[in-house]
């Protein structure tokens, strides 16, 4: 199979999986990204031109705001990918886990730590020019999924992600990077629409950020989970099975 056909096949599977699982993924995304949307809205209200400080301090404030906005746009994606991994890989004979069951299985501390460190290394990569941020973004994109799928430690998740991506860097990059860019573009469009309908206050920004992330984050997370499973299978010959469609709810038989 050529690289192009393999890549197109991955995108087709992402689309099919997203459509099949949207009824359960979108509420899960709402739980994660509505609170984070408020933080995004606050950070996007920063206006360095209004600060009564010297140009040096204004530049520092601008750089700080840039880092904060970059971090806020990425934070939550790794955590959400871990939650999606639980939902998409439950045993075939079992019903899909409920929100409460997913909440009970999530490794909160490890995923939050992985999420924070992932954002940190990308922010550090910004100071090493964009190439550094791009490399870190791709090599560690699978960290959250492997932490949940294989119960790694925080550092073990980063190491495992690097191992899986190594040798497949451009394949992974060709999936996660365009999805991140397109997702950001859609998110910006939703925020703009929200401002045009609701004004320019923090409520409009919060609504736009939340809705944009709820719509786009599942695409990225589904892609991460599918790539993780594919690369596990390629490397070791086996991987957790992807549950392609939610099982229909079967009514209990009468006694």
For every predicted segment, state its role.
Residues 1, 13, 49-53, 80-95, ...:
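Juxtamembrane transition segments at transmembrane-helix termini in multipass membrane proteins
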Residues 33, 39-41, 86, 234:
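Hydrophobic alpha-helical segments of integral membrane proteins
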Residues 74, 130, 147-151:
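Short helix-coil transition sites and intra-membrane helix breaks within transmembrane domains
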Residues 62, 66, 70, 77, ...:
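A conserved helix-loop-strand patch within extracytoplasmic ligand-binding domains
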Residues 35-73, 98, 103-105, 126-133, ...:
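Membrane-helix interface segments in multi-pass membrane proteins
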Residues 2-35, 101-125, 136-188:
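Interfacial aromatic "cap" segments that immediately flank transmembrane helices
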Residues 4-8, 60-65, 73, 77, ...:
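Solvent-exposed, acidic/flexible segments
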């Amino acid at each position: 199979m050529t690289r192009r056909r393999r890549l197109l096949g991955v995108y087709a599977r992402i689309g099919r999986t997203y459509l099949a699982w949207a009824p359960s993924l979108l509420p899960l995304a709402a739980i994660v990204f509505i609170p984070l949307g408020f933080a995004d809205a606050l950070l996007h209200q920063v206006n360095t031109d209004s600060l009564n400080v010297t140009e040096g301090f204004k530049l520092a404030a601008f750089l700080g705001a840039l880092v904060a906005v970059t971090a806020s746009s990425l934070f939550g994606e790794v955590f959400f990918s871990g939650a999606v991994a639980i939902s998409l890989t439950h045993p075939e004979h079992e019903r899909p886990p409920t929100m409460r069951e997913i909440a009970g299985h999530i490794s909160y501390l490890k995923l939050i730590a992985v999420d924070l460190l992932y954002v940190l290394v990308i922010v550090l990569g910004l100071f090493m020019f964009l190439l550094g941020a791009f490399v870190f973004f791709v090599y560690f994109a699978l960290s959250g999924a492997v932490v949940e799928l294989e119960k790694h430690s925080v550092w073990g998740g980063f190491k495992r992600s690097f191992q899986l991506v190594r040798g497949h860097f451009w394949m992974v990059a060709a999936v996660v990077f365009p999805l991140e860019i397109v997702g950001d573009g859609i998110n910006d469009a939703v925020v703009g629409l929200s401002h045009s309908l609701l004004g320019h206050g923090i409520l409009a920004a919060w609504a736009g950020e939340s809705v944009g992330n709820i719509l786009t984050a599942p695409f990225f997370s589904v892609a991460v989970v599918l790539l993780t499973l594919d690369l596990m299978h390629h490397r070791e010959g086996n991987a957790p099975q992807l549950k392609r469609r939610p099982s229909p709810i079967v009514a209990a038989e009468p006694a």
